Amino acid sequence: MLIVLSASGAFAQVLATANSPEYKSILKMSASLFTRSTFQMGYERFLNPNNSVYLTAGLNFRDSDYEKEWGVRTEAQLRFHVFTVIKPKESNRLYFAPYLMNHYLETEGQSYDNNGAYSWNTDTFDAFGGGMLFGWSFSFANRINLDIYTGGGFRKTFNYNNTNSYNDNTVFDYGYSGIVPRLGIDIGFWF
């Protein structure tokens, strides 16, 4: 009995059922970067059942009384799906993915001197990074995909001149250089 169950589980990892058409592409939107004023879309294409390429592009925009931002963010990942279970109406995939990213940003913010007078300071910088992500991709209703990932890597920022005294140069600062954690959620659909 155990042999039959383990063999059927291995067979389910490789083949999709007749009720679940095998789509090869996913269009995604980043729900987690939306909280940082970034609209990011991504395209994942499966090269074979165990490997895919994921390319993303996003725009930053924020305009408030004290701060203005505009930027472009791009990223490329090569995903290795190490565990896959495909059922008629859902599928689960665990993966790891090395990534490379670039983030160009123009910022403008107010800074105050000792007398309470403020002035606008502008800054433009480029950030490059790379690292490793680990994630779980869950597909349901034959078309909807939920992708949750975590990981980290390095980030190096060029041309950043921090003149704002309120920035503490943590991983949440756009001009940060160093080791960065990553955590995110993408929502998409198969086609």
Annotate each language-model stretch with its function.
Residues 14-23, 49-50, 83-93, 140-146:
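Short loop/turn motifs that connect adjacent beta-strands in outer-membrane beta-barrel proteins
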Residues 58-69, 102-126, 157-176:
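Flexible, solvent-exposed loop segments that connect beta-strands
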Residues 1-20:
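Cleavable N-terminal export/targeting peptides
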Residues 33-35, 45, 57-63, 80-82, ...:
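Transmembrane beta-strands of outer-membrane beta-barrel pores
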Residues 41, 76, 96, 132-134, ...:
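Membrane-embedded beta-strands of outer-membrane beta-barrel proteins
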Residues 25-29, 53-55, 74, 92-98, ...:
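Transmembrane beta-strands of outer-membrane beta-barrel proteins
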Residues 75-80, 177-191:
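Outer-membrane beta-barrel "beta-signal"
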Residues 20-22, 32-36, 65-73, 89-91, ...:
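Transmembrane beta-barrel outer-membrane domains
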